[in-house]
């Protein structure tokens, strides 16, 4: 297995798909990394030479990926919550922050339904 940016890239996949195992690298960025490194993106990872892998490591190193990206996203969300702006409040309450309806739906953000308390007489 090839190791790039601290992630084991699956050997059986094409380079373009294999690079998407790195957090912060999707299909488009993966293809652009391969083109910039001069590596054929349809080639399997196991068929890459050490020189090709080194070029890919160098190109991936130019982007914010994995732990640094996760930390950056977390800090951005924390900043919004500290500001107390609308998006920060919605993050804090665990509700959708992009204007979706919440009377029905929004189950992914809100979590499983809780049983309603029965009123005492």
UniProtKB/Swiss-Prot annotation:
Region (Disordered): 92-121
Keyword terms: Ribonucleoprotein, Ribosomal protein, RNA-binding, rRNA-binding, tRNA-binding
Subunit structure: Part of the 30S ribosomal subunit. Forms a loose heterodimer with protein S19. Forms two bridges to the 50S subunit in the 70S ribosome.
Name of the protein this chain belongs to: Small ribosomal subunit protein uS13
Regions annotated as coiled coil: none
Family per record: Belongs to the universal ribosomal protein uS13 family.
HAMAP family reported in the protein's UniProt record: Ribosomal_uS13
CC annotations in GO: cytosol; small ribosomal subunit
Superkingdom of the source species: Bacteria
SUPFAM superfamilies for the chain: S13-like H2TH domain
Main function: Located at the top of the head of the 30S subunit, it contacts several helices of the 16S rRNA. In the 70S ribosome it contacts the 23S rRNA (bridge B1a) and protein L5 of the 50S subunit (bridge B1b), connecting the 2 subunits; these bridges are implicated in subunit movement. Contacts the tRNAs in the A and P-sites.
Lineage: Bacteria, Pseudomonadati, Pseudomonadota, Betaproteobacteria, Burkholderiales
One annotated GO molecular function: structural constituent of ribosome
A biological-process GO annotation: translation
Entry-linked InterPro entries: Rbsml_uS13_C, Ribosomal_uS13, Ribosomal_uS13-like_H2TH, Ribosomal_uS13_bac-type, Ribosomal_uS13_CS
């Amino acid at each position: 297995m090839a190791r790039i940016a601290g992630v084991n890239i699956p050997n059986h996949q094409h380079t373009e798909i294999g690079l998407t195992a790195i957090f912060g690298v999707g299909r488009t960025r993966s293809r652009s990394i391969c083109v910039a490194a001069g590596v054929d993106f349809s080639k399997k990872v196991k068929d890459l030479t050490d020189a090709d892998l080194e070029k890919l490591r160098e190109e991936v190193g130019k982007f914010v990926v994995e732990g640094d990206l996760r930390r950056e996203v977390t800090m951005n969300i924390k900043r919004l919550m500290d500001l107390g702006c609308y998006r920060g409040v919605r993050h804090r309450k665990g509700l959708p922050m992009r204007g979706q309806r919440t009377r029905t739906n929004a189950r992914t953000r809100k979590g499983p339904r809780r049983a309603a308390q029965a009123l005492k007489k």
